[in-house]
């Protein structure tokens, strides 16, 4: 791992409503609480953490493009874009930054349209159904992978 590795956490549409939206699926934590916990975890590991949440696909794509050469690992919860966005997939493949896909709910136990991901087959790993803790596991895994380099 370099002196100060950088990890980017990307969150897709409607995740700004965490804590309000369908808590039976997504839990009671707000996105701010999740990001605060990740920031502390990253700080304790000596890693820089950046975060972006957007309801706009193009903003997530632009953030991925801007990450090239600057970010060492991406953690992404593409939310509904998981099932629709070839563009996000292409952006991630284009910059060739390793990434982990995270979902708060178990997408495989939900509606059939949520079972397909355009990202999973290219991800270093996929974590779903573990709520906010899934982000912490993803960050730990990303840090471990960077340390193994």
From Swiss-Prot:
The reaction(s) annotated as catalysed by this protein in its Swiss-Prot or TrEMBL entry are: 3-dehydroquinate = 3-dehydroshikimate + H2O
Function of the molecule: Catalyzes a trans-dehydration via an enolate intermediate.
Q: Where is this site: Transition state stabilizer?
A: 21
PROSITE patterns, sorted? DEHYDROQUINASE_II
> Which family is annotated?
Belongs to the type-II 3-dehydroquinase family.
What is the protein name given in its UniProt record?
3-dehydroquinate dehydratase
Q: Gene that codes for this?
A: aroQ
Q: List the taxonomic lineage.
A: Bacteria, Pseudomonadati, Pseudomonadota, Gammaproteobacteria, Vibrionales
**Subunit description:** Homododecamer.
Which residues carry out catalysis? 26 (proton acceptor), 103 (proton donor)
Which EC class, in a word? lyase
Which is a GO BP term held by this UniProt record?
A: amino acid biosynthetic process
Which spans are transmembrane here? none
Q: Which species is the source of this protein?
A: Vibrio parahaemolyticus serotype O3:K6 (strain RIMD 2210633)
Instruction: Cite a single GO MF annotation.
Output: 3-dehydroquinate dehydratase activity
Pfam families from the xrefs? DHquinase_II
**Record's superkingdom?**
Bacteria
What does the record give as its pathway? Metabolic intermediate biosynthesis; chorismate biosynthesis; chorismate from D-erythrose 4-phosphate and phosphoenolpyruvate: step 3/7
């Amino acid at each position: 791992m370099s002196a100060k590795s950088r990890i980017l956490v990307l969150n897709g549409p409607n995740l700004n409503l965490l804590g309000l939206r369908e808590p039976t699926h997504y839990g009671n934590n707000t996105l701010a609480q999740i990001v605060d916990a990740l920031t502390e975890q990253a700080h304790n590991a000596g890693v820089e953490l950046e975060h972006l949440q957007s309801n706009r696909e193009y903003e997530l794509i632009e953030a991925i493009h801007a990450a090239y050469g600057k970010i060492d690992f991406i953690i992404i919860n593409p939310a509904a874009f998981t099932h629709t966005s070839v563009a996000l997939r292409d952006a991630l493949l284009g910059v060739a930054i390793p990434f982990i896909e995270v979902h708060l709910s178990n997408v495989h136990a939900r509606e059939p349209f949520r079972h397909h991901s355009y990202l999973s087959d290219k991800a270093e790993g996929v974590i779903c159904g573990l709520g906010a803790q899934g982000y912490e596991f993803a960050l730990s895994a990303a840090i471990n992978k960077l340390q193994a380099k």
